[in-house]
Each structure stands twice: as C-alpha cells, then as structure tokens.
Regions:
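Binuclear metal-dependent hydrolase catalytic cores
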Residues: 1-150
C-alpha cells in the first residue's frame, strides 16, 4: 500500500451551501465557478482504501462529480444536518460493493444519527431494507483505520 494520501474536498460551503437556494451569493463573486460550494464532506484515499468524512446533503452530487464509487468507512465529526443528511446515499455504495460500511463518531453523535436513520443500522421488516451501516463509537483515541491514523 502506498503512503500517499489523496484528499478531496467534496464540499466546503456553509450549512446552506453557496449560493443560497434563492440564488443569493452574499460576498461571493457569482461569476467565479470556484464560489459554487456544496456542503461539507471530505474524501481520503490511500492505495485502494478510502474514508469519507461527513455525508453532506449534497453527497450524491459530490460522489458523481468526483467519480467516487467506493467508501470503506465514514467518520462523522458531529450530528448536524449539514454533515449527516446525505447518509442515505451510502446505500447504493454498500449495495453495489456488497458490504456494510463501518461508521465512526462519538457516542452522542452516533446515537443521534442512528435514531434519525435507524433503517440504515438495523433490519426494517416493514420495508425490507437490510442494514448497510455498522456503528463504531470513538472517544478521543487515535483511530487506526484502513491504514489511516486519525
């Protein structure tokens, strides 16, 4: 495995994104394409392993735009909507790759995420969804994950 880590900033906009949904740009120059910013997510790749940090509501667009079809693990920085509400877009990746995706967060954040998106973590007999995420609580320790030390 190579030591080179590729970091792709998938989104770096505010919780609203830039521009706002009413095409409000604030102080950003609307003629500069770099000022179109989706909400926060980061993708790390090292060899054939990858980690996604946060699942913004813009995740589907971010994955397609950056030709990302594999996510080996997800780390959530916190449970706010702008960092979690793209979580459902992990379903297609898990189904195509035929494996559950481990997700990591502190206990409170992970409980909030699991309560909001329980169908991704536990079998839902009503709708027939198989769980596609595996929860892992982290607590201020160094995480050695797929060759990444975080």
């Amino acid at each position: 495995m190579t030591d080179k880590i590729e970091l792709t900033v998938l989104g770096c906009g505010s919780s609203f994104g830039v521009p706002l949904s009413h095409n409000i740009w604030g102080n950003c120059d609307s003629t500069n394409p770099k000022n179109y910013r989706t909400r926060p997510s980061i993708y790390l790749k090292k060899g054939d392993k990858s980690i996604l940090i946060d699942t913004s509501p813009d995740l589907r667009h971010q994955l397609i735009t950056n030709k990302i079809d594999t996510v080996d693990a997800v780390i959530f920085t916190h449970a706010h909507a702008d960092h979690t509400h793209g979580i459902n877009d992990l379903r297609s990746i898990a189904l195509i790759n035929k494996k559950k995706i481990p997700v990591f967060a502190d206990k409170n954040s992970l409980n909030t995420i699991k309560n909001s998106f329980s169908y991704l973590f536990t079998k839902n007999d009503k709708h027939g969804y198989e769980p596609i995420l595996q929860k892992n609580i982290i607590d201020n320790e160094i995480l050695d994950l797929n060759g990444f030390k975080i």
